[in-house]
Amino acid sequence: MPYTHPDDNNLKNLHKAMQYSDSQEPELRVNIGEGIDISGTVNIPGNLTIDNFPAIQPVSGTVSVDSLPEPVSIDDNGGSITVDGTIQIAPGSYNSTGNLDNSVDAFGRLRISDMYTLFDSSLRYDDNPFKWDTALSGTGAINHLLNESSMQMSTTGAGSVIRQSKTVFSYQPGKSLLSLTTFAMGTPTAGVTKRAGYYGAENGIFFELDGTNIKIVKRSSITGSVVDTGITQPFWNVDKLDGTGPSGIDLNEDRAQIFWCDIEWLGVGSVRTGFVINGQFITCHIFHHANTETGVYMTTASLPVRYELISTGAASSMKQICSSVISEGGYVNRSRTRSVSTPLTGKALSDVTYTPLVSIKLKNNRLDSVVVPSKFDLFGLQQAAYKYQLILNPILTNPNWSSLNNLSDVDYDISATGLSGGIVIDEGIFVGSNKGGSIAVSQTDVDFSQQLGRTIAGVSDIFCLAAIATTNNDDAVGSLTWQEHS
């Protein structure tokens, strides 16, 4: 039988002084009314609260805190805190590998809803020729897979297939640019190279399957020549996706994948790359440049989306599926507005065929510019009905292309005498009278749907405003306005 002192004041109502810890171990609450001298080291595993302000809490010697999971705040409850000596507050932890938190964008901002889609593409019914251009060589071929909403790219021997977006996408300094590209590359084959990503012929970031070698590649032309820096899977600096990385996942390169990269270009920023697997962004490799390079790491971040299949002789195939390019943190329209018009004396129109009034295209040496038609104006010089059309890529008769000025990205024509072919993207009616009118090509402040594109071979789109009259040789005046995004 245990020894008890039922009349001992120190032991009466002992249960009232007891409490249990989080691990259900008994603890004794005590109230210390006088000072305690402590020598040596005292480890306090939980929280220590000092709340008897405005009393003085003297501390001598050194107080060391190994780690703090939350920000530290000091509340003096309206009094004052006096500190003698030096306080050293260590900076937040620095990860030399880079920004590994995929809940934030390339600049460390929390990924929230303020994202502006610059481009998206799916292939539900066809090869989407308004958005994509194709270049074939040798045995290269494409085939639309209706039931898979995909494009099959294939070779039966030596040959190649390139699928590239007709437009490049406007990068704004200080905003993260996120690219997502989906594909199925199939079985790795010797002598066959397969690529997909955010890149063009001279610059960009992409995933590559070179035979059986898996790479993430940075392409740059800053030296005047194209240089590919390919990082093979064993040398990825975050998650090698070989089962040993933070995710524990093995990359199945022959299966359908979502490749992503986000770019903080600014000429010298970092580029994060990886895959989206099981709904999670997994960072595989980060290209760092600030504090390392002597200049920019690639010429521009305004680039196209591109897929490639190249074979030196083997039969091969891969599938292009979907892609998207997003400006994270929104997009602010800081474009330059430019316009050109016919002479005020007007241009004689036919009553049978459409006559081009104003046409624009990208300059041959500025094919990576972002140019978006925004509005047009029409005025008939006779009291009669007229019709207009906006035509993409007509064949113009006797055009005389001129540069608006040295700063503009556009050449224009107001001299062509006729046109044929092309795709009508809008049409309507206007009436000759004592006043004209403006018509918007796009209905929002920032709308890239009518952006001028170019082919892989370097041929610009032509955007043409044309009109037809009720009576032959009736005259009309026209002007075309566009935005140039740097």
Residue ranges and their predicted role:
Residues 189-211, 280-283, 459, 467-486:
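C-terminal interaction-tip segments
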Residues 171-185, 329-469, 477-485:
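Beta-rich globular "head" domains
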Residues 90-219, 224, 231-237, 288-353, ...:
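Low-complexity, Ser/Thr/Pro/Gly-rich disordered linker/stalk regions
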Residues 273-275, 390:
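Conserved aromatic beta-strand anchor motif in extracellular beta-sandwich/beta-rich domains
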Residues 13-17, 205-212, 263:
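Broad, structure-driven detector of short, well-ordered beta-strand segments within folded domains
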Residues 1-134, 332-385, 428, 433:
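Extended, low-complexity segments enriched in Ser/Thr/Gly and acidic residues that occur primarily
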Residues 225-258:
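Short, aromatic/His-centered strand-loop micro-motif at the edge of beta-sheets
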Residues 254-270:
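Localized edge beta-strand/strand-to-loop motifs within extracellular or lumenal beta-rich domains
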